[in-house]
Amino acid sequence: MHSLFKQLVFFLVMTLTAADKAAFDAESMLEAPRRSAVVSNPLGNLGIFIESNYSFADHKYNSGIYLLNESTRNHQELLVHGKSNKALTWITDSAFLYAREDNSSSSSILLFDVNNRSERIIYNHNSSISDIRIGEKNNHYRIVFSSVDNSLVKGPSNVHVYDHLFVRHWDRWNTGSRNTLYFIELDKKTENSNYFEISSEKAIDLLKETGLESPVEPFGGLSDFDSNYDKLVFVAKDPKLNPATQTKTVVYEINLNTRNLKSLSTAKGACSSPRLAKDGNHIAWLEMQTPQYESDQNQIMVYESESGAKKHIARHWDRSPSSIEWGVFKGGEPGLFAIAENYGKQILFFVSIFHHQVIPMTEEHSVSSISVPKSSSLWLTKSSLINPPYYAKINVETLNESVLLENNVGLSPTSYEEIWFPGTHGHRIHAWIVKPESFDKSKKYPVAVLIHGGPQGSWTDSWSTRWNPAVFANAGFIVFALDPTGSTGYGQRFTDSIALDWGGKPYKDIELGVEYIKNHLSYADSEKMVALGASYGGYMINWIQGHPLGRQFRALVCHDGVFNTLNTFYNTEELYFSIHDFGGTPWENRVIYERWNPSNFVNYWATPELVIHSSKDYRLTESEGIAAFNVLQYKGIPSRLLVFEDENHWVIKPDNSLRWHKEVLSWILHYTKDCNANEDETF
């Protein structure tokens, strides 16, 4: 056990000196502008977005709504509010709606007129508003917005009583509040003005007494519903099933004239991204066929309202789109624009609903969002490993792409590259290599191997403020971020291959990746390697710790990882996850849980390890981190435990994130110095 004095010494040396800081570091990353998705007006000549900047001097965000001109590429700030702005939605070509939180228990929908730079409140609501959809017919508008119904919340007692699951989800206890969809109506007073008046007395809760909740917790939002003047389509969990053991969500339709509700989908898995076509007759969505499997392939379905016919589009396509939007492609061909992971990038595709062709539209970087105006160009929100979110447009006829608004932080395109190396079972494994901006090929650099979570996830060419490879690279490391067996974007069979095999093929792929580093990267100092991972990546850190590969690393970092696979099932909230990946419950298939249980190999643990966990992480509870730290301390292995009391599975708050980066970088820098890695000279 380390002395208090040594702990204080570590705290003092933890902060890098100004001389040691790279031009791009954790602080500059966290203070860089954070942009929302850009939203084009119907005409396609203007876009709006929200930009936030965090100041470590003031310890607060400054947020504003900006207008981007497509022809001039100029952008200007329209609104600055200390309060939260969100849900930007154009109502005409020169006016948009947005939601603003007034306090913890109320919010407003406001209209902003771009022509005269004026705003006014359209509607006040007694809860937070998250997203807005608009439908129009003959200057009459129907607004559907998502909000929270708190009418069933019991208070002011701090006692929770439960008769069913979920007890808690992601980072909060189930208190009885529910997500729902509300409906109001507006009238446009004159044809050529942006003056609207509300024509409904109060918002109608469209899901009241249905037993349905939408958007779906914990990450549901605008993608969970769509509406026009006559219809609302949305997804919700099947109320007849246990939400903690089943992934099934259903696509529903509500007739906004009669309020009639009907279900459209029959899939046993999750459905998402319901979208209404302009003709009002066709509805598309994504659906998974496998129950209890959140990473099953998303398949595109199209439903025709008049006939009730449903068909599976592009059945041959072996990718899993995350979102879809209706639109028109070359020559006026109708279809769907889909974003899907593909070989380490998020690519925009066009999917023909008639010919079932799938055509890639973008090549570089990653697309996170698209906006589809009436013009021939789509507005894209993109990012890369070196660029925070920026905006571009792409012509659907020529596929020519141009940048509308850059977002540079001074990182060079030559600082990263992608490679492939031979993996298990004949698979080729993809990895990103990120180098310091001051890279000199004649020198040798320590190596940081990054292992992603999921496990059905991937390292894509996109920006992150949580795990940003460029931050590690510019602290002096060669970053090797690989996608082992189970990763997404390489075909569904590759993704599915990790089931029942958490510590098998993925571990071997990482071993082969380390061999690739040794044999092919002349500038990599393979004697000074560290490995870091979060969630499943944290599981893999603890698994590596108990196996031979662990001795090839000077230090390890485990963020919100798994220590005991059995306890993980019993303590988590989404039980279906372990049920799928381990082939049942622990009492049904204990042999698989035990086979891949890191706690069964603690006798072999020996490498210094930093353990990080958060108290509001209900996906992998903090007892997993404490258990790992207990073992490390009992065995006398150099170790450190970092606990965030106010964070969940992710460390989001900027000041916490800065501390996270300082702790992690100090740990791996210490153990890759020119000293005996087993010496505990700092701590």
UniProtKB/Swiss-Prot annotation:
Keywords: Cytoplasm, Glycoprotein, Hydrolase, Nucleus, Protease, Secreted, Serine protease, Signal. Glycans are attached at N53, N69, N103, N116, N126, N400. Its EC number is 3.4.14.-. Residues 1-19 form the signal peptide. GO terms for cellular component: cytosol; extracellular region; nucleus. It is found in: Secreted; Cytoplasm; Nucleus. The active site is at S535 (charge relay system), D617 (charge relay system), H649 (charge relay system). GO terms for biological process: proteolysis. Disulfide bonds: none annotated. Coiled coil: none annotated. GO terms for molecular function: serine-type endopeptidase activity. Gene3D superfamilies: alpha/beta hydrolase. Belongs to the peptidase S9C family. PANTHER family: DIPEPTIDYL-PEPTIDASE 5 (PTHR42776:SF13), SERINE PEPTIDASE S9 FAMILY MEMBER (PTHR42776). This is Dipeptidyl-peptidase 5. It comes from Schizosaccharomyces pombe (strain 972 / ATCC 24843).
